[in-house]
């Protein structure tokens, strides 16, 4: 009797479902992608109990012809490719023909679909078997309902996470789909509670606001660039807005959300030393390239891809983000943390209006799962944008709020036109208009004329030092507080980065050579990278089994720390044996700058302090130390005037009553 036999189609589909359908989020992803491929512009995702009970996808796409409905649930049946050539130039999200049969084999599926001008079709499939197929009075588009997921695969059902965890996975993938297809209006509802509603108007910035919150969207800047092979665009957050996970970086390749470690790493490295260790930006990166340069047929989920010329793309992304971030003045607002604790709910409502009305419409306070967050003013205080919609909001506040401003007494509206009120407004409001935050479109778009005229780093005049740790300086826009250690660390980092790259032949001979001994495993790695050490001026001579002797060192070493510096440099290769020369130089420069910089409680004279400020101004990046900490913060003139009540809130022009 033959031992090898062909598996039944239902069993084969259930096996395939192990890769295609991992959890309810996989079902949502596959079905929504089918809707997008069908030309849908409105897709409603309605789930119960995070998809464990039911998942319903309703779209207004092209629908499926009656004669194709049953065929669509057969393995490798698709309308998206025909021959081998199509496989290497895929323009659709799906093409393998595995999703529908895999889903139907492990659940109870009911689908109603219709094409324009024709009667609809309803089909009911459970466990891969067709139970019913009838005509139906359906509108154009498709409605598919999946219930009892994994009812016949108890092992898979057993290892699903909690309802909240599964809901977060669904929310995450829907967010990514909304970001990659901004022209499609997506809504997600769980147990009657709406979690997301995107506008579907093609505005990426607005979609980001709907997902991450309007305040976060305000702190993201637009970037775009193109060369012969690639076109990249998107939004990325300023260094002050970060997260503890790389999960907030969304990579979109030809409209497909993908995961790629090298591209994610390129985004992070584009920030250089502007990010704190362990912190990551919020980024939406869209990459457009010829489909022949990318292979999406790597895994059934199609989230893992292979890209030709990946190294060139990595360099291109890193360079584009680095240059875009470099255009920004990254001095943080010194009162940001204080403001964040005292902001009232009213300020948050005003801020939401600032992005645009459509963003306000689709902002949802219930969206708390997955990568989304309900942003409140208590977390991200931000200056308000002076746009038309905000002005209308402020006018409403003026009418409702009454504030006593002695000694000016206003009895009626005519008194608002008095000379004293005009004099007050001219004195305390006219100059503030010059420092208003620009609109979000200007802020996140190309640099406007006003910003081009503003120097990237201010001219500072030294005032004094506090506790041997902070330097105080004044500039045209206000008071600046400088962390003296972080400032000198930045200056020395850029100095050592350049010096280490020179590899001067001049060496300092050691009176007593340094002898280093390592275990065999470490010695093998050191031998593998010994040429890289030579490029930085570290010459290790063989001095017996697993032992090395150093007789000289570069002149930029700090006296008395020669052995510790060399050991630390060698440790870099022991931790990462594939460390590149460029990364090695950067790590060494960071180490040297930290070791040779002044510390806290170190009192400086005026000449030394002024020298640090002058050197800081010449730095390529004067805003952060090599570890990402801020070098200085600013208290603007307006902030100081607010603190001393020299200017009042915008609603001070309300009608007042005389006692």
UniProtKB/Swiss-Prot annotation:
One family name in Pfam for this protein: HATPase_c_3
Keyword vocabulary terms for this entry: DNA damage, DNA repair
Keyword DNA-binding recorded: no
A molecular-function term among this protein's GO annotations: ATP binding
Signal among keywords: no
Any single GO CC term annotated in Swiss-Prot or TrEMBL for this entry: mismatch repair complex
Top-level taxon of origin: Bacteria
Gene3D superfamilies xref list: 3.30.230.10, Histidine kinase-like ATPase, C-terminal domain (3.30.565.10), MutL, C-terminal domain, dimerisation subdomain (3.30.1540.20), MutL, C-terminal domain, regulatory subdomain (3.30.1370.100)
Disulfide bonds: none
Swiss-Prot/TrEMBL GO biological process terms: mismatch repair
Record-linked SMART domains: DNA_mis_repair (SM01340), MutL_C (SM00853)
Annotated family: Belongs to the DNA mismatch repair MutL/HexB family.
Name of this chain's protein: DNA mismatch repair protein MutL
Native organism: Ligilactobacillus salivarius (strain UCC118) (Lactobacillus salivarius)
Lineage: Bacteria, Bacillati, Bacillota, Bacilli, Lactobacillales
Gene: mutL
């Amino acid at each position: 009797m033959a031992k090898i036999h062909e598996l039944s189609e239902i069993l084969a589909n259930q096996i395939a479902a192990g890769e295609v359908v991992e959890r309810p989020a996989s079902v949502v992803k596959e079905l929504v992608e089918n809707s997008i491929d069908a030309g849908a512009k409105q897709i409603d995702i309605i789930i119960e109990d995070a998809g464990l009970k039911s998942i319903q996808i309703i779209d207004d796409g092209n629908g499926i012809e009656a004669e194709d409905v049953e065929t669509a649930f057969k393995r490798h049946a698709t309308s998206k490719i025909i021959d081998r050539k199509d496989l290497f130039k895929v323009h659709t999200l799906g093409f393998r023909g595995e999703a529908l049969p895999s889903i139907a084999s492990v659940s109870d599926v009911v689908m109603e679909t219709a094409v324009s001008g024709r009667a609809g079709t309803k089909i009911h499939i459970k466990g891969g078997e067709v139970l019913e197929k009838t005509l139906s009075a359906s509108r154009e588009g498709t409605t598919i309902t999946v219930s009892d997921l994994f009812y016949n695969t108890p092992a898979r059902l057993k290892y699903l996470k909690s309802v909240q965890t599964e809901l977060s996975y669904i929310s995450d993938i829907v967010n990514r789909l909304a970001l990659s297809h901004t022209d499609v209006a997506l809504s997600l509802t769980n147990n009657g509670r709406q979690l997301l509603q995107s506008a579907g108007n093609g505005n990426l910035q607005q979609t980001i606001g709907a997902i991450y919150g309007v305040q976060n969207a305000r702190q993201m800047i637009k970037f775009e660039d193109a060369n012969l092979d690639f076109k990249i665009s998107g939004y990325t957050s300023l260094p002050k807005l970060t997260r503890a996970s790389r999960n907030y970086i969304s990579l979109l390749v030809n409209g497909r959300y993908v995961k790629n470690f090298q591209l994610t790493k390129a985004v992070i490295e584009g920030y250089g030393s502007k990010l704190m260790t362990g912190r990551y930006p919020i980024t939406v990166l869209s990459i457009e390239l010829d489909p022949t340069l990318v292979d999406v047929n790597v895994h059934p989920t199609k989230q893992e891809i292979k890209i030709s010329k990946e190294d060139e793309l990595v360099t291109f992304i890193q360079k584009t983000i680095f240059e875009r971030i470099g255009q920004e003045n990254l001095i943080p607002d010194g009162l940001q943390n204080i403001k964040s604790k005292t902001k009232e709910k009213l300020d948050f409502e005003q801020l939401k209006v600032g992005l645009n009305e459509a963003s306000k419409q689709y902002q949802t306070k219930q969206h708390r799962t997955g990568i989304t967050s309900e942003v409140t003013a208590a977390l991200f205080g931000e200056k308000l944008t002076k746009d038309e919609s905000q002005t209308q909001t402020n006018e409403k506040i003026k009418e409702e709020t009454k504030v006593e401003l002695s000694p000016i007494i206003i009895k009626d509206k005519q008194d608002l036109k008095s000379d004293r009120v005009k004099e007050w407004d001219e004195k305390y409001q006219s100059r503030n208009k010059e420092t208003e935050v620009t609109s979000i479109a200007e802020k996140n778009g190309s640099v406007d004329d006003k910003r081009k005229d503003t120097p990237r780093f201010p001219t500072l005049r030294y005032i004094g030092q506090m506790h041997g740790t902070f330097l105080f300086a004044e500039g045209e826009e206000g008071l600046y507080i400088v962390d003296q250690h972080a400032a000198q660390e930045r200056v020395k980092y850029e100095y050592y980065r350049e010096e280490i790259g020179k590899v001067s032949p001049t060496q300092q001979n050691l009176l007593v050579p340094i002898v280093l001994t390592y275990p065999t495993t470490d010695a093998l790695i050191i031998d593998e990278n010994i040429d890289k050490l030579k490029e930085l001026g570290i010459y290790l001579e063989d001095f017996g089994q697993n032992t090395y002797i150093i007789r000289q060192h570069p002149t930029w070493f700090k006296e008395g720390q020669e052995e510790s510096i060399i050991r630390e440099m060698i440790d870099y290769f022991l931790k990462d044996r594939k460390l590149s020369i460029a990364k090695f130089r950067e790590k060494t420069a960071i180490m040297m700058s930290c070791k040779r910089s002044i510390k806290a409680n170190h009192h400086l004279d005026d000449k030394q302090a002024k020298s640090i400020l002058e050197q800081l101004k010449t730095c390529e990046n004067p805003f952060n130390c090599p570890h990402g900490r801020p070098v200085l913060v600013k208290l603007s003139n307006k902030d100081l005037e607010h603190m001393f009540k020299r200017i009042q809130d915008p609603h001070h022009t309300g009608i007042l009553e005389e006692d």
